[in-house]
């Protein structure tokens, strides 16, 4: 309570009195006291270090690192790997830290990894060491992602025509027998029962063999005859060129009828005048060019 009035009095005494004469020491003492109080306040405030901020432009451009930062990061990584291998510095390969990798121990599955999303066991993500085992995971072998294997069906058994058990083997004809049969066929295509029996005995053949040979030979002759007739028809057909115009009439059509009517009316006017022959004018509507040129040549 007593300090505040004293301070006011000091200020009144310091600024109320005019400077000069014997009272000049009072203002200097007050200034010294104020400077001492300001120095104590500055010492009590925390000093701001002039070092650069870590994310400022100057810090990024300078890229100064403390000498103990690398050692601390190495120690932290070693301790993390010794604890369980969960933590690893970002951007640093695992072999560069001097710690050998453990290939046999699989890494635990994370929440956002492939195995974690698909809920697969850890053994499914480990690569097969032996080359004989196919590198296919269970989700690839499921029918949802891969088609089912094709069933190998056994080939159907080839069913052959069953012959009769009492069927006689086919006896090939000799050259002499074939010549005799061909000569007899040219003479007569149909044999009677007596002629067939006599002819078969002369060739040392059965009547059935001679009968079947004549039947086959008649069928062959019929096929050859039909082929020859087809060739003759193709040769006799005239090779006409396609029509030059769409509209055409036969030669001497409506024009010939009109000419004949005019000749009957005006042709025989005199006793010594010849009868006029109907001449069809050559034009667009008489006949197509190909047909007329073919018959003119």
UniProtKB/Swiss-Prot annotation:
Interacts with CREBBP/CBP, TBP and SP1; interaction with these transcription activators may inhibit autoinactivation. Interacts (via C-terminus) with PIAS1 (via N-terminus); the interaction is required for the localization of both proteins to the nuclear periphery and specific binding of MSX1 to the core enhancer region in target gene promoters. Interacts with H1-5. It is found in: Nucleus. GO terms for cellular component: nuclear periphery. Sumoylated by PIAS1, desumoylated by SENP1. Sumoylation of Lys-9 and Lys-127 not required for interaction with H1-5, transcriptional repression, inhibition of myoblast differentiation, or binding to gene promoters. GO terms for biological process: embryonic morphogenesis; inner ear development; negative regulation of gene expression; negative regulation of odontoblast differentiation; nose development; positive regulation of cell cycle; positive regulation of odontogenesis; regulation of odontogenesis. It comes from the Eukaryota. This is Homeobox protein MSX-1. Gene3D superfamilies: Homeodomain-like (1.10.10.60). Residues 1-50, 63-109, 127-157 are annotated as: Disordered. CDD domains: homeodomain (cd00086). Its main location: nucleus. There is a cross-link at residues 9, 127 (Glycyl lysine isopeptide (Lys-Gly) (interchain with G-Cter in SUMO)).
């Amino acid at each position: 309570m007593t300090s505040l009035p004293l301070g006011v009095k000091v200020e009144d005494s310091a600024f109320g009195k005019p400077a000069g004469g014997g009272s000049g020491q009072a203002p200097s003492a007050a200034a010294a006291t104020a400077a001492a109080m300001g120095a104590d306040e500055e010492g009590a405030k925390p000093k701001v270090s002039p070092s650069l901020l870590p994310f400022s432009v100057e810090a990024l451009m300078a890229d100064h690192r403390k000498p103990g930062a690398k050692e601390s990061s190495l120690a932290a990584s070693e301790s993390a790997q010794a604890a369980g291998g969960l933590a690893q510095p970002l951007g640093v390969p695992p072999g560069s830290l001097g710690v050998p990798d453990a290939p046999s121990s699989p890494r635990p599955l994370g929440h956002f990894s492939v195995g974690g999303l698909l809920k697969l066991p850890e053994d499914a993500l480990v690569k097969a060491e032996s080359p004989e085992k196919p590198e296919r995971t269970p989700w690839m072998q499921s029918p949802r992602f891969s088609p089912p294997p094709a069933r190998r069906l056994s080939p159907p058994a080839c069913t052959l025509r069953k012959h009769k058990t009492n069927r006689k083997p086919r006896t090939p004809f000799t050259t002499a027998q074939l010549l005799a049969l061909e000569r007899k066929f040219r003479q007569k295509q149909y044999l009677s029962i007596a002629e067939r029996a006599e002819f078969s005995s002369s060739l040392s053949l059965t009547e059935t063999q001679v009968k079947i040979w004549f039947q086959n030979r008649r069928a062959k002759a019929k096929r050859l005859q039909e082929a020859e007739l087809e060739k003759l028809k193709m040769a006799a057909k005239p090779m006409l060129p396609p029509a030059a115009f769409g509209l055409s009439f036969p030669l001497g059509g409506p024009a010939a009828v009109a000419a004949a009517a005019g000749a009957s009316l005006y042709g025989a006017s005199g006793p010594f005048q010849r009868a006029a022959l109907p001449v069809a004018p050559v034009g667009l509507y008489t006949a197509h060019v190909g047909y007329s040129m073919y018959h003119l040549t």
